[in-house]
Amino acid sequence: GLGALSERYDHELYEKAYAHCDVLIIGAEPAGLMAALTAGRAGLDVILADEHDQLGGRLLSEMEHIDGMPAAAWVQAAVAELAGFANVRIMANTTVTGAYDQGVFGALERVGLGVEALPEGLPRETFWRIYTKGAILCAGALERQIAFANNDRPGIMAAGAMRSYLNRFGVSPGQRVAIFGNNADAHRTARDFAQAGVEVVAMIDSRAEAQ
């Protein structure tokens, strides 16, 4: 079952680099963006690192409002403000890989992610050693699947994934959906699908006190 290693020579460039900051913010979901805005406005040297190419995390897939704006519009405004700060560095496509002694963090920046032919001299990846006075972990939450038989069959999805399809990409996972959950996230999913005109045939909540 072992595959064969490629014998082709890797012509890509891989670099290492160093950076220094007052505060390293890991993750650019809502908490990370607010932390970066607060630190940036206070004049601190900030590095905001996120493993995705777009900042905002779950807000890009939600219909909620922040400060009177749709979540995605709020993200755009926040990112635009951060980009205007000379003391804030945004590192997208960057995964913080470890925390070490003396405030040192390792981070892998995938510079050429999604680029088939890189410009000459541009590395495919850069490994950063970041020296910081403090760090804030804002990695977000991970939705836990509910365990039941055959929960990995086609058509069975996590609620967050369904809302990402619907709200972020404009695609419905189906014409008729049944939703099962044990928290308010399930009701949020049912609301979004109903507002989009998708038939919600069942809303099942395991909590006795749910309304």
Question: Where are the model-predicted features located?
Answer:
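Residues forming the flavin
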Residues: G1-Q211
